[in-house]
């Protein structure tokens, strides 16, 4: 393999931790050998260089994370998951827990139940662009009732999550998804996750091109070993469509040393990637996908006639962090360069291989690509990617200002049909709303799309169907956007408790009461009902609902306790910062009332709350909050 870095390497950190004491560990590149004793039927694969840290400075062997060992010994994601799935136990062992993530599932327990482990599995689908065929939606709806908890969860990466599946039902559920034009392969795990793109079914050249590019990138980076089909449909590889030839060509191309030519995983090898990897594609100006939060952000560039001609590429975004570890941080992506449209798959592959070869595999807190770029700087990273790309990146093309698009309500597709964006609180589809949505989707044979804001788009609607669909949705409590509080329209929360093992407090179950309390504060301080701020809540610092881009972010840091983050902007182009730690749920008004009072009284015309907090500065805002605590009238 090319691109190895010789000698020792120091893993320092910059950015958010620049002013803080930072631990620096001496790292060195090593070669990870293939499994010494591959399972029957295993193929030998090329080695992947893992950038790791010795356990001690004088250690003779490099210590890799346990997940790296599990991947190495798994025979390309098969073993020991295949054995654990047929055992009588209701759960699977730790090695299998790590591997089943690659197949699109997490093992969970119900944390509301005390004194025993109630095991179940969450399944997550892979839906590039959020596209869901009619057949798949109806299948997921049925599976939720028969094998889940009776609800479907729409996610911030345009997928479904199905909670509460018992181990004994996993194969039935996954095989049903596969046989109904769906997949869960790569929805979790150390590889490329679901690829985002604008969810709206507009018949516009740039939107269609962004969606097609997202689907091609998803296909390029899909695991190839066949383990997924071996485990869930007994080796029958069910394809809904032939792979585009340009995808196959790009995957197989090894002219710049990107591939393991003798491996069933030519891009990933035995070790896959160091950590999760996220890609989004969008049209210029459309930031419905939170483009700067991804490992790779791809933006369609068009000529004066509106014809797509290439792409601007951003790299190094990511939300996850760890409380009290200041060397971990959320980060916005940097501009990498421009590529002609025919080169996009090769450029994407080169970036992925750079992360594969140079991302840290010793400490998973630092394994995301954002830390490599923060450590190296964008110029060094670009030079390394160009070795695998085989070309120089061109200069960024000018882009318009970003705008957030929710795609809610009735809109023209551009082909004579309509689409309707349904606002779904927290993305949780259940009860009468679930029943009504199924009836509409089934009756009118509609395809749907899932948005990155956890909402659902009904696609391809005839004009004559508009009135009966609007009436049916309203009767089920799915109101038109004009009838929903603006706070709710842009708010997001992760599922958190009771099933997520990482949650430190509530998110989904707590956000609606919090939004009502924010609206009450607005009313108290004289902010109009039509006004809003972007609120996002997560139960832990991993950032699944992207709270670090919110104007007002709540990040769980203990039972009924949150960090408060301020400074994101409505178009999701600015990173928020931590404003206050350990704010108890019962005390949030003590922080919000002085902040909103000060915003309402001193903001510039049309100034958003996020822009206001950035202009004012945290020192002044903390002074305002502290004075309010001493005497509200003095603030």
Swiss-Prot record:
PANTHER family linked: SULFITE REDUCTASE [NADPH] SUBUNIT BETA (PTHR11493:SF47), SULFITE REDUCTASE [NADPH] SUBUNIT BETA-RELATED (PTHR11493)
Cofactor dependency: siroheme; [4Fe-4S] cluster
PTM comment, free text: Phosphorylated; this phosphorylation reduces DNA-binding.
Keyword Heme carried by entry: yes
Annotated consequence of substituting residue 193 to A: Loss of sulfite reductase activity, low nitrite reductase activity and reduced siroheme redox potential
Main location: plastid
Cofactor-binding details, from the entry: Binds 1 siroheme per subunit. Binds 1 [4Fe-4S] cluster per subunit.
Modes of activity regulation: Inhibited by the tryptophan-modifying reagent, N-bromosuccinimide (NBS), by the lysine-modifying reagent, N-acetylsuccinimide and by the arginine-modifying reagent, phenylglyoxal. Complex formation with ferredoxin prevents these inhibitions.
Pfam family, one: NIR_SIR
Region of interest (Disordered), ranges: 31-50, 245-267
Gene Ontology BP term (one): plastid chromosome packaging
EC number: 1.8.7.1
NCBIfam families, A to Z: PRK13504.1 (NF010029), sir (TIGR02042)
GO MF terms held by the record: 4 iron, 4 sulfur cluster binding; DNA binding; double-stranded DNA binding; heme binding; metal ion binding; sulfite reductase (ferredoxin) activity
Domain of life of the source: Eukaryota
Similarity annotation: Belongs to the nitrite and sulfite reductase 4Fe-4S domain family.
Listed Basic and acidic residues bias regions: 245-254
Protein name as annotated: Sulfite reductase [ferredoxin], chloroplastic
Signal peptide: none
Encoding gene, per UniProt annotation: SIR
């Amino acid at each position: 393999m090319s691109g190895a870095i010789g000698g020792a390497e120091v893993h320092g950190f910059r950015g958010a931790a620049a002013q803080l004491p930072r631990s620096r560990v001496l790292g060195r590149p090593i070669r990870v050998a293939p499994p010494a004793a591959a399972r029957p039927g295993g193929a030998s694969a090329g080695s992947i260089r893992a950038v790791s840290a010795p356990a001690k400075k004088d250690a003779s062997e490099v210590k890799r994370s346990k997940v790296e060992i599990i991947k190495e010994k798994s025979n390309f994601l098969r073993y020991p998951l295949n054995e654990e799935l047929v055992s009588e136990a209701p759960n699977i062992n730790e090695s299998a827990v790590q591997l089943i993530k690659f197949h699109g599932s997490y093992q969970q327990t119900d944390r509301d139940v005390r004194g025993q482990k109630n095991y179940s599995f969450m399944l997550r689908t892979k839906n590039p662009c959020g596209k869901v065929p009619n057949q798949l939606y109806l299948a997921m709806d049925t599976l939720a009732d028969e094998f889940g908890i009776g609800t479907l969860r729409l996610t911030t990466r345009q997928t479904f999550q199905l909670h509460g599946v018992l181990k004994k039902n996993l194969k039935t559920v996954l095989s049903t998804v596969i046989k109904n034009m769906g997949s869960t392969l790569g929805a979790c795990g150390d590889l490329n996750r679901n690829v985002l793109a604008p969810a709206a079914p507009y018949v516009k050249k740039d939107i269609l091109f962004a969606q097609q590019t997202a689907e091609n990138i998803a296909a390029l980076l899909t695991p190839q070993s066949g383990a997924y089909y071996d485990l869930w449909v007994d080796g029958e590889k069910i394809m809904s469509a032939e792979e585009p030839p340009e995808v196959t060509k790009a995957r197989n191309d090894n002219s710049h040393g990107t591939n393991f030519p003798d491996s069933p995983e030519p891009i990933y090898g035995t070790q896959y990637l160091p950590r999760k990897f996220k890609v989004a594609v969008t049209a210029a100006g459309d930031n419905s996908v939170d483009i700067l939060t991804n490992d790779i952000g791809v933006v369609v560039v068009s000529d004066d006639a509106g014809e797509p001609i290439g792409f601007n590429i951003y790299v190094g975004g990511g939300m996850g962090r760890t409380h009290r570890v200041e060397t971990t941080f959320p980060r916005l992506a940097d501009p990498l360069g421009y590529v002609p449209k025919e080169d996009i798959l090769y450029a994407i592959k080169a970036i992925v291989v750079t992360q594969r070869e140079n991302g840290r595999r010793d400490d998973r807190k630092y394994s995301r690509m954002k830390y490599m770029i923060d450590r190296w700087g964008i110029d060094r990273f670009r030079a390394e990617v160009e070795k695998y790309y085989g070309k120089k990146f061109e200069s960024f093309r000018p882009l318009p200002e970003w705008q957030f698009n929710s795609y809610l309500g009735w809109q023209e597709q551009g082909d004579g049909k309509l689409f309707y964006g349904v606002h779904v609180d927290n993305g949780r589809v259940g009860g009468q709303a679930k029943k009504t949505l199924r009836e509409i989707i089934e009756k009118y044979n509609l395809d749907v799309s899932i948005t990155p804001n956890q909402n659902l788009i009904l696609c391809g609607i005839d004009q004559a169907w508009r009135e009966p669909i609007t009436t049916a949705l309203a009767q089920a409590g799915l109101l038109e956007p004009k009838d929903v509080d603006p706070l709710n329209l842009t708010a997001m929360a992760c599922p958190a408790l009771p099933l997520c093992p990482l949650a430190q407090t509530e998110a989904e179950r707590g956000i609606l009461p919090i939004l009502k309390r924010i609206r009450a504060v607005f009313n108290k301080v004289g902010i109009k009902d039509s006004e809003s701020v972007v609120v996002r809540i997560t139960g832990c610092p991993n950032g699944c609902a992207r709270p670090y881009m919110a104007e007002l972010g709540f990040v769980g840091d203990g039972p009924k306790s949150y960090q408060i983050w301020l400074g994101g902007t409505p178009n999701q182009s600015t990173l928020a910062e931590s404003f206050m730690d350990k704010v108890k749920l019962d005390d949030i008004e003590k922080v919000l009332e002085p902040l909103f009072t000060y915003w309402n009284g001193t903001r510039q015309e049309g100034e958003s709350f996020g822009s206001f907090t950035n202009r004012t500065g945290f020192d002044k805002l903390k002074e305002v909050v502290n004075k309010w605590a001493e005497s509200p009238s003095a603030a």
